[in-house]
Swiss-Prot record:
The lineage of its organism: Bacteria, Pseudomonadati, Thermodesulfobacteriota, Syntrophobacteria, Syntrophobacterales. It is found in: Cell inner membrane. Keywords: Cell inner membrane, Cell membrane, Membrane, NAD, Quinone, Translocase, Transmembrane, Transmembrane helix, Transport, Ubiquinone. This is NADH-quinone oxidoreductase subunit K 2. NDH-1 is composed of 14 different subunits. Subunits NuoA, H, J, K, L, M, N constitute the membrane sector of the complex. It is a multi-pass membrane protein. InterPro entries: NADH_UbQ_OxRdtase_chain4L/K (IPR001133), NUOK/Mnh_C1-like (IPR039428). The keyword Translocase applies.
Length: 114
């Protein structure tokens, strides 16, 4: 039984919407990263459905690229989250001022060059 292309796009759209909700509505950095991963998987489902619909390999090639981007995003994102948690003790994005240049420079000036 072949799944209609409209159903595949409906599933991908629902997953993408769920990922957007998870990334926007939560106040937790891990949930934000999880929401972005759900959105990338929804895009992968849409590309696979389109590749099956039009019998082309480009959709599958895009999925491999998306998987590489997702793996990179998870590894770098979780490393940043672990660093930020060790520094502040919280997963709440509102608690972070780590991206301000002044904060980094003040921290460097207090410690001095190493």
């Amino acid at each position: 039984m072949i799944v209609p292309f409209g159903h595949v796009l409906l599933l991908a759209g629902a997953l993408f919407g769920l990922g957007v909700f998870c990334a926007v509505a939560r106040r937790n950095l891990i949930m934000i990263v999880l929401g972005v991963e759900i959105m990338l998987n929804a895009a992968s489902i849409a590309f696979i459905g389109a590749a099956a619909r039009w019998q082309s390999m480009e959709g599958q090639a895009f999925v491999l690229f998306i998987l590489a981007v997702a793996a990179t995003e998870v590894s770098i994102g979780l490393a940043i989250i672990v660093y930020a948690f060790r520094r502040t003790g919280s997963f709440d994005p509102a608690a972070y001022n780590l991206m301000k240049a002044g904060d980094a420079m003040q921290s460097f000036e207090r410690r001095g060059p190493q």
